[in-house]
């Protein structure tokens, strides 16, 4: 059975259902008053991966959502977003290095 024939997962349903609510909540948060993913999940009855997927989708749509170890917030300036962007770019480089390692696993140079 092709993967495309499976119904939406509960994770995807949670993302679709709660994205607007999460956005409204984050718009009320500043860098000085962040909310954790755990708090968002508890308030909405969803798991951490769904919270992260919602934040990811909102960022893809252009919403300036910053994050740190303290939680998430709606950024008010590019300066507030800079550390989040740097962190995401570091993750990209790390994942690319892992992918390169996997490519070499059966094709050593």
List PLM regions with ranges:
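Short amphipathic alpha-helical interaction segments
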Residues: 46-57
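Short, charged/polar, Gly/Pro-enriched secondary-structure boundary elements
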Residues: 78-84
